[in-house]
């Protein structure tokens, strides 16, 4: 949607009066070999250590671009960068301003932000629940993994490390393990399509189902619980307890407060013999 709005703006503004960069005066910048004049429309402090800037760019043919950006001093003790999820679950969406308002609490005020990732704009899961707003790629907020990235691509992510530094790069979610009785399999996905020869975790914040009917009969699933207040996060060791019988449906139900472990290929044997009360350890 953002791309469509931007392109519409270019088309509507393309009929503006044209003039050379020299005639327009001021600063210029070259983008993809095209020279634009630059005019600063707005620059002000909008929060602790943070300024917002709005730029207006015009080239010789009259095409115009608008640029909005924030600059933040991360050494300011009153400012930090955090990721939040609109509805605190995988599906569902919201505007940046509504997300800031709904997540602001006493002692923590979200005063600016940017939208990230592409998300589903239509569709339903196999149980009929909407998947609108669900991120297409990885999503991690507050240390909790809402969705892992796809194993089939090295799509880059933007993330903040433990030192508060911004990073952009590919992130692998296939470095974890799942252990039962001393035997181990690779943890390959969280709230995403299950790769072969590994185990995937589906949380109460997903669609209410692993949503993969095409692997019915080709997988092993088991419902489990996690200690109340715990969550699936990178670098954590989780202790699950089996709370129901195993199954073979890739679109089984995820009951309220429960998780589902799903194994494919060589990892199926690890889950197939589990019974109610058995414990499963996972390192994420």
Regions found by a protein language model. Give the residues of each.
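Bacterial Sec-dependent N-terminal signal peptides
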Residues: 1-25
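Acidic, serine/threonine- and glycine-rich low-complexity intrinsically disordered segments
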Residues: 231-233, 263, 279
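Loop/turn positions that initiate beta-strands
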Residues: 274-281
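Zymogen propeptides
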Residues: 22-256
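Residue-level recognition of conserved beta-strand edge/terminus positions
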Residues: 122, 282-283
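Short, conserved secondary-structure segments in the cores of folded domains
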Residues: 269-273
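Short, structured beta-strand/loop micro-motifs enriched in basic residues and often containing a Trp
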Residues: 250-268
């Amino acid at each position: 949607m953002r791309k469509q709005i931007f392109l519409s703006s270019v088309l509507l503004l393309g009929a503006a009066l044209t003039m050379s960069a020299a005639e327009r005066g001021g600063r210029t910048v070259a983008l993809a070999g095209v020279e634009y004049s630059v005019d600063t429309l707005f620059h002000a402090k909008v929060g602790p250590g943070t300024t917002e800037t709005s730029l207006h760019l015009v080239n010789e043919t009259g095409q115009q671009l608008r640029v909005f950006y924030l600059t933040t001093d991360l050494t300011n003790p009153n400012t930090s960068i955090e990721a939040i999820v609109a509805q605190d679950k995988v599906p569902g969406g919201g505007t940046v301003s509504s997300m800031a308002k709904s997540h602001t609490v006493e002692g923590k005020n979200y005063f600016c932000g940017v939208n990230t990732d592409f998300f589903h704009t239509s569709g339903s899961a196999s149980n009929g629940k909407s998947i609108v707003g669900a991120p297409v790629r990885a999503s991690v907020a507050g240390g909790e993994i809402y969705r892992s990235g796809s194993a089939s691509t090295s799509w880059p992510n933007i993330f903040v490390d433990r030192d508060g530094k911004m990073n952009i790069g590919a992130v692998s979610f296939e470095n974890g393990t799942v252990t039962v009785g001393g035997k181990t399999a690779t943890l390959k996905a969280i709230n995403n399509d299950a790769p072969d020869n590994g185990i995937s975790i589906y949380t109460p914040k997903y669609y209410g189902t692993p949503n993969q009917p095409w692997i019915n009969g080709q997988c092993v699933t088991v419902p489990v619980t996690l200690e109340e207040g715990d969550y699936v996060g990178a670098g954590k060791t989780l202790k699950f307890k089996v709370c129901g019988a195993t199954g073979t449906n890739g679109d089984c139900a995820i009951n309220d407060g429960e998780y589902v472990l799903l194994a494919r290929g060589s990892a199926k044997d690890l889950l197939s013999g589990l019974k109610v009360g058995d414990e499963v350890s996972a390192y994420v």
